[in-house]
């Protein structure tokens, strides 16, 4: 089958060997696996991080967002059947979605939203799982509680879903941060009650909207830069969740306010085969339903054409430039 791989980490994306086309054997499903014929994928920042930073002894297939049709199932599969259209973010320890076929454990896949094209649906799994787990599993927000949530980087892939989930599924006051006018408009359109600029002091802006402290913070970008300000605006016994990778993070400033710190990584359940791994199937099923009843909308941005090394190099370059708006999707071979 066709696949796009890298075999030498850290090459600049302008180098044709940073991602290249090849042929590999079609995989065979294990007991809980679906063999999926992949129709569309999305590209995420994690793709570029792995390509740049993870050495590999054999050519590696990246990609952790996919939409396709189930072609075969393992002997113990019970949630899906051949012919089902599915979407998933996959398992970072297994070959990814830059290929004609892929394997995914049924416990971390969902039925694709019927109302979306394959490409638009491909934008959803990784960011939806991350946002949902952050909001309801890490921060443990109760849907009926009255409190405020500050989302730092609300216009990005995860932030765009998190803003929608918080506004549509909870009673939280949702405050998003964005710096560019077009991103501020985007975040407002997604449902944020307030949008403030993270390039200006947060405490002053929160006080100006009558919300001097917040119970919850979802820090999606540059946590180390904003950390002192986040501690300042968090209420006593508040909760801070993050997804990025600061080199170091001194947690001591959290002690005085008894603020709890929560890291979200949507790959954890599949990496460690946790007892609740099937929760990701359940989340994706709910996301699919919310999309089909028009509660959530896709965050697909740019469609870069077919799934090829040349187009994936363009996608990686866009992400590395910081200029991507919305999720980058590709479809077909």
Question: Predicted regions: what is each one?
Answer:
Residues 87, 215-218:
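N-terminal Rossmann-like NAD(P) cofactor-binding module of classical short-chain dehydrogenase/reductase
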Residues 225-296, 332-333:
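Glycine-rich phosphate-binding loop and adjacent beta-alpha segment
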Residues 25-42, 50-95, 108:
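Glycine-rich beta-strand-centered segment in the early N-terminal region that forms part
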Residues 89-153:
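NAD(P)H dinucleotide-binding glycine-rich loop of Rossmann-like/cofactor-binding domains
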Residues 289-302, 313-333:
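C-terminal capping/lid region of NAD(P)-dependent oxidoreductase domains
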Residues 201-212:
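Short amphipathic alpha-helix with an adjacent loop that forms part of the alpha/beta core around
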Residues 124-200:
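Mid-domain Rossmann-like dinucleotide-binding core that forms the NAD(H)/NADP(H) cofactor-binding site
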Residues 97-98, 179-186, 248-251:
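Short, glycine/polar-rich helix-capping loops at beta-to-alpha or helix-loop-helix junctions
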């Amino acid at each position: 089958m066709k696949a796009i791989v890298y075999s030498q980490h850290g090459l600049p994306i302008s180098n044709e060997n940073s991602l290249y086309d090849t042929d590999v054997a079609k995989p065979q499903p294990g007991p809980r696996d679906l063999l999926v014929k992949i129709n569309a994928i999305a590209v995420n920042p994690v793709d570029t991080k792995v390509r740049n930073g993870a050495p590999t002894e054999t050519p590696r297939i990246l990609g952790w967002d996919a939409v396709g049709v189930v072609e075969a199932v393992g002997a113990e599969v019970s949630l899906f059947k051949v012919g089902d259209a599915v979407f998933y973010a996959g398992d970072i320890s297994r070959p990814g979605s830059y290929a004609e076929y892929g394997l995914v454990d049924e416990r971390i896949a969902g039925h694709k939203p019927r109302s979306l094209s394959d490409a638009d649906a491909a934008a959803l799994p990784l960011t939806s799982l991350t946002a949902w787990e952050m909001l309801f599993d890490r921060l443990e927000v109760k849907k009926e509680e009255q409190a405020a949530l500050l989302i730092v980087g609300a216009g990005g892939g995860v932030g765009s879903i998190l803003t929608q989930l918080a506004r549509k599924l909870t009673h939280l006051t949702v405050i998003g941060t964005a710096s560019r006018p077009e991103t501020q408009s985007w975040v407002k359109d997604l449902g944020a009650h307030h949008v403030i600029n993270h390039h200006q002091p947060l405490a002053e802006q929160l006080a100006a909207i009558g919300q001097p402290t917040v119970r919850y913070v979802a820090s999606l970008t540059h946590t180390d830069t904003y950390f002192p300000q986040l501690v300042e605006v968090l209420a006593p016994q508040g909760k801070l969740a993050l997804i990025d990778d600061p080199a170091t993070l001194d947690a001591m400033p959290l002690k005085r306010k008894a603020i709890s710190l929560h890291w979200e990584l949507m790959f954890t359940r599949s990496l460690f085969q946790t007892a609740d791994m099937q929760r990701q199937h359940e989340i994706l099923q709910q996301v699919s339903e919310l999309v089909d009843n028009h509660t959530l909308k896709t965050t697909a941005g740019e469609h870069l054409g077919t799934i090829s090394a040349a187009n994936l190099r363009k996608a990686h370059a866009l992400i590395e430039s910081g200029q991507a708006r919305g999720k980058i999707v590709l479809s077909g071979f």
